[in-house]
Design a protein with these regions (language model features):
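Acyl-donor-binding surface of acyltransferase catalytic domains
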Residues: 1-43, 166-168
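Conserved GNAT acetyl-CoA-binding A-motif
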Residues: 1-7, 130-140
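Short acidic/polar active-site loop segments enriched in Thr and Asp
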Residues: 1, 22, 99, 135, ...
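C-terminal, charge/polar-rich interaction regions
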Residues: 93-101, 118, 140-144, 148
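Flexible, substrate/cofactor-facing loop regions flanked by secondary structure
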Residues: 40-110
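Residue-level recognition of the GNAT/N-acetyltransferase active site
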Residues: 6, 109, 113, 142
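Conserved active-site alpha-helix within GNAT-family acetyltransferase domains
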Residues: 7-25, 119, 143-161
Length: 168
């Protein structure tokens, strides 16, 4: 059984320790300001495809609960751009929330990981979101997902909240 509590909540952490629950992992909420004039890495194609709520996929039903969902896709410029719509090398989902946008399910094809494609994709995506009027972007990531943590730190995200999970 798992319990969760805010990392700052010392009284809950003491109670969980008293019953023998052990810290298992943390989930972080990360955020980053969006800047229109930000430098974009060359060599990447990025497109945001707006999706109507009735076209939601199973992957994004739980996140948006009826709101608009966007799908962002990317590929290296040396690839066939029209093919990127059916076989993108990088994908993510975006859920607009007022002046912020929530990013989730960022994926790079396994055979292309550790080649800076995620960094290049975010460098192209983030200014596009700023041009759409968004002020910040938010996401959630597990402390166990070290490659994702490194990517987000490298691209300017910072931790705004920590939720700790304890196993009992």
């Amino acid at each position: 059984m798992y319990f969760s509590c805010s990392a700052e909540n010392e009284s809950w952490k003491n109670i969980l320790g008293h019953i023998g629950a052990e810290h298992a992992w943390d989930e972080y909420m990360l955020e980053r300001k969006l800047i229109i004039s930000e430098k974009t890495e060359a060599g990447i194609y990025c497109r945001i495809v707006e999706t109507a709520p009735e076209n939601k996929t199973e992957a994004n039903d739980t996140i948006t609960s009826g709101n608009i969902v966007w799908h962002a896709i990317g590929c290296r410029l040396n690839q066939n751009i029209p093919l990127s719509f059916t076989s993108p090398e990088v994908t993510c989902f975006l859920a607009p929330q007022g002046e912020s946008v929530y990013l989730y399910s960022l994926q790079v094809l396994p055979e292309l990981r550790n080649r800076h494609l995620g960094t290049a994709f975010l460098s192209a995506l983030l200014p596009r979101l700023a041009k759409k009027g968004f002020k910040s972007i938010k996401l959630q990531v597990s402390s166990k997902n070290l490659p994702a943590m490194a990517l987000y730190k490298k691209t300017g995200f910072y931790i705004t909240q920590t939720l700790s999970f304890y196993e009992y």
